[in-house]
Amino acid sequence: MPEGPEVKLFVDELNHNFRYYQIKSINVLSGRYIKNPIQNLSLLLNKEIESFNCKGKFIWIDLDDLIIFNTLGMTGNWSRTKTKHSRIEIEFYENDKLYFNDIRSFGTFQIKTRSDLEKKLKSIGPDMLSNPPNNFVNLLRKYNHKNICCVLMNQNIVSGIGNYIKAESLWYSRINPYSFIKDLKVENLITLDKA
């Protein structure tokens, strides 16, 4: 599953290649959105992509008054290449195309408003890459009664951490994944913050 670092790389690449492109057409090619159509898809036509952004694993595409919410799920990605797993095709007036590919169809694509975005961003914890918590130890101590893995994987507490980052960080910090936060030394949590 793409985690914070991979999502950030996708977003950086999308901004580099497609920022300020204008949407000519958008088509659902396959997957779940054939049976359950995306609401208000036609509203995206002729919109200019102002920016691609992310917080943790959550991606949003800013189209001024509209926002596209996107998650990659287990196997999603954005590419110029159409594959048999391409779910959505976006064609631009700039003679280019962008495909949302998703082998397992766990990714999401929704059209929302700016107020929806504000609510969504408030519900997501601080981004592990660009906005780590100022006081990581105190943040974790709020969840003393919980298992360290459950807290790290909860995107509402700290966003962008998935299985491999959790495993590598805990190993580096010498923290048993079955530990409860209350049983951990401050030194372990400080090392975890740096991991």
Set out the residue ranges of the language-model regions.
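Surface-exposed binding/hinge segments that line
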Residues: 1-111
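Hydrophobic (often cysteine-bearing) scaffold residues that line and stabilize catalytic clefts
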Residues: 3-6, 161, 192
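Generic alpha-helical secondary structure signal
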Residues: 5, 39-42, 115, 134, ...
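Residues that form generic nucleotide/phosphate-binding pockets
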Residues: 10-13, 17, 26, 43, ...
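Flexible domain-boundary/linker segments
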Residues: 24, 31, 40, 153, ...
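Short amphipathic alpha-helical patches
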Residues: 34-38, 163-164, 179-181, 192-194
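Phosphate/anion-contacting hairpin/loop surfaces
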Residues: 64-172, 180
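A broadly conserved sequence feature marking short terminus-proximal activation segments
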Residues: 171-195
